[in-house]
Amino acid sequence: MESNPVYEHLGIEPLINAFGTMTHIGGSLMAPEVTAAMAEASRSFVPLRQLQERVGERLAELTGAEAAFISAGAASGVMLAGAACLTGTDAEAVARLPDVGTRPSEFVISLVDDHTYIHQSLRLIGGTLAEVGTTDTVSVDNYAAAINAYTAALVVFLGEQSRTQLGEVIELAHAHDLPVIVDAAAQLPPRANLVEIPAMGADLVVFSGGKAIAGPQSTGLVLGRRELVEACVLNSSPNFGAGRGMKVGKEEMVGLLRAVELMLADDEEARVRDWEEQCRQMMRAVGDAPGVTVDFNPPYSASFPAAAPFLRLCFGVNAPLPA
């Protein structure tokens, strides 16, 4: 593995990543084209609201969504999506958060989503939670039973919850004139999800910018209904809403846009085949080793992300090397 002088100077040894696009090890690695675009963006001042608007328009063009917005990570995107459902584009309501007054402020969210920070983030903006189902399963009937006059939105964690169930939740929510927020942070690849999930009718869909998109790790991509995306913008920086502290710089905006452009132009099938071959090479190398158990999940058989193959190695006490 090549040394990295930036980390050497700090006394930190880089890792060999055999885990995936995990936040705690840095997400993904950006392509040279992305870092070059970010460096170029850093050389000029620019009207940030204008850049935010134009980048959003371009991302919407690329994905076919009504509108798009770059957040400071996917968790920030879910929080701002929640704020958008609480305030709409009402400037006074934006200024009052987390005081929601008499507005509907309850989010119906499943307990199968064990990302507690998502639950916390919706409370931070003044929301309350109707947590439904169990840590193992949730049904559309669970969602339906929780809807009341105080409901602001329904939240779906795609991956733990299936696309089929998402469609059912969307149908249920829209029958009650309620929006649906989809946490799809790790649901790329396939890149078709960028287009297909919003096209299902999900009102706000949030992807990580620093996982499979391979943009800046501190970015998220919010796609959805124009009015609600505009409400996300009002609640975020450089405006004076509850999300002011979740700043996205000009460099990150330009970097994520370039990363999305590269992702959409990439030969995804070839990339997935390459990943699968890497897994099979490892299987051939260690599969017969004593004490080593191999569990291979081919592409499109898992949930995080759906298209990625996974190889799990379990080391027993008689394995030649410790785990």
Language-model-derived ranges and their functions:
Residues E2-I25, L29, G56-I70, A75-L264, ...:
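Conserved PLP-enzyme active-site core in the AAT-like
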Residues L62, L264-P299:
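Conserved PLP-dependent catalytic core of the aminotransferase class-I/II
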